[in-house]
Amino acid sequence: MTEDFEVNLGTGGEDNSSSTMEHRVLDSPPRVVIPEDTESPAKLAPNHGIFMASINKSSPAGKKSGEGAVLGMGAQSTKDNSTPRQNSSMLSTRVIESLHDQVDTLTSTNLQLTVQSKNLLDKLDTAQQKESKMLENSASLKHENENLVSMLNRKTRRLKDVEEELASHKKNHDSLEEEKTALQKKWESSSSEEATLRQQMEMVQAQYDALVDSHQYYKSHYSSQISTLSEQLENLKLEQRNYTQRVSDEANTFNAKLLEFDSKHANLQQAEETRVKYLESKYDSLTQQLDLPSWVQLYRESKNMVLEFAEKMKLKIPSDFETLIQDPELTALEAKNPNSNNAAALPLRVAKQRAGGGNATSTQSGTSGSNAAHGKRSSFYGGMASSYPASTLPGTLPGVRRSSSRRKPSSRVASDNSNSGDSSPIFPHSAVATAPRSSATAPSSRVSSTSTSSSTNHFAFHNNNSNNTYRKRQESTSVGNS
């Protein structure tokens, strides 16, 4: 601890009142407890000399005496330089006087300093006592301060904990406030919904009462209708039983008729199969009698001639003719008979004529008449054709005169011509009934009748009676020609 002390310097009360004393602030000595025996002068002597020297340097009397001494020494030196002998006595006297003055001054000063030092020692004792008390107070205050610091730390930690708890409680409070707000809104909405539901419940209750009343009404109404419908249902059941019995009787009758029809159909199918077999055998025999390669060769020559003529004359071939020559059956027949290019190698079959007989005579006369009538008709190329010799081979080109011989008629070709509705058949049955036909038309009709043999066979199957009659007549005609 630091204390300030004021030291008054002077020789007496007059000096203190008349002159200004110099004040010096001294630092307190270190905190060392001085024992009571420090008041002895022997122990204070070293420090007293140092203290007095500093006082002399700082006091004005000392300064004056020093200055006087210096002046005296200066004057003495000057006197010594001028008159050393005269001034030596005066100088010594003055030095002695000054020394006496200094001794008196120092004595008074010593007394004053002794009194002052005693006062200072008293003050030092009191200050040390105060310091010891203050040290004790400081120690107690320090201990109390430590206790207060520890308590403050505990309170600070407690305060932090309390602040954390306060923050958590604030968060909980905010969340509870939000939850309260949400619950308040939910309660308000639930209250409005409750009011709405009450209104709806009242409406539903009214509707339910109305439905109960209507249910009672409809129950009574429909119970009466159900009783009526049950009576009608009983009547309908009775009618249904009668109708079922009647239908079962009719079904039994129909089954008996159906069995009878099945037996008749089986017999008819068997007869039909027998007739088909007979027709197939007849068709095979007629196919064997028919000279098919010669007809194919004749068709090929006619087709080539027509195409060549149309190319030379620059004529457009009709679409019917193109369709005819592109017929798959005719193309297949041409492919099956690739070796029938020579007409002389495969001549057409002709029926032999008898020398006598009415049929032969009529045939010859009819043939000669037809040849005479068509002897000068137009040829195929537009010119007038002359009479051709009778030695022309059969199967020649169209436009030639036929010989007196006749082919053996085919029942298949005749049936095709009769079914197609042609009034003038290709192979005449007698000389009187034969109509003159152009030789250019006859080969194409024969070929077309041959190409449609399968379709006409089915048609002849359905027209059984007419075919049988025509077949018998054709057979009799062929027998007469032979």
UniProtKB/Swiss-Prot annotation:
<comment type="function">
    <text>RNA-binding protein that binds specific mRNAs including the ASH1 mRNA, coding for a repressor of the HO endonuclease. Part of the mRNA localization machinery that restricts accumulation of certain proteins to the bud and in the daughter cell. Required for the delivery of cortical endoplasmic reticulum into the emerging bud.</text>
</comment>
<keyword id="KW-0813">Transport</keyword>
<keyword id="KW-0175">Coiled coil</keyword>
<feature type="compositionally biased region" description="Polar residues">
    <location>
        <begin position="413"/>
        <end position="423"/>
    </location>
</feature>
<dbReference type="GO" id="GO:0051028">
    <property type="term" value="P:mRNA transport"/>
</dbReference>
<keyword id="KW-0694">RNA-binding</keyword>
<keyword id="KW-0509">mRNA transport</keyword>
<keyword id="KW-0256">Endoplasmic reticulum</keyword>
<dbReference type="GO" id="GO:0048309">
    <property type="term" value="P:endoplasmic reticulum inheritance"/>
</dbReference>
<dbReference type="Pfam" id="PF17078">
    <property type="entry name" value="SHE3"/>
</dbReference>
<feature type="region of interest" description="Disordered">
    <location>
        <begin position="1"/>
        <end position="90"/>
    </location>
</feature>
<feature type="compositionally biased region" description="Basic and acidic residues">
    <location>
        <begin position="173"/>
        <end position="188"/>
    </location>
</feature>
<feature type="region of interest" description="Disordered">
    <location>
        <begin position="163"/>
        <end position="190"/>
    </location>
</feature>
<comment type="similarity">
    <text>Belongs to the SHE3 family.</text>
</comment>
<dbReference type="InterPro" id="IPR031398">
    <property type="entry name" value="She3"/>
</dbReference>
<feature type="region of interest" description="Disordered">
    <location>
        <begin position="390"/>
        <end position="482"/>
    </location>
</feature>
<feature type="coiled-coil region">
    <location>
        <begin position="127"/>
        <end position="292"/>
    </location>
</feature>
<feature type="compositionally biased region" description="Polar residues">
    <location>
        <begin position="360"/>
        <end position="371"/>
    </location>
</feature>
<keyword id="KW-0472">Membrane</keyword>
<dbReference type="GO" id="GO:0005789">
    <property type="term" value="C:endoplasmic reticulum membrane"/>
</dbReference>
<feature type="region of interest" description="Disordered">
    <location>
        <begin position="353"/>
        <end position="378"/>
    </location>
</feature>
<feature type="compositionally biased region" description="Low complexity">
    <location>
        <begin position="430"/>
        <end position="469"/>
    </location>
</feature>
<dbReference type="GO" id="GO:0003723">
    <property type="term" value="F:RNA binding"/>
</dbReference>
<protein>
    <recommendedName>
        <fullName>SWI5-dependent HO expression protein 3</fullName>
    </recommendedName>
</protein>
<feature type="compositionally biased region" description="Polar residues">
    <location>
        <begin position="75"/>
        <end position="90"/>
    </location>
</feature>
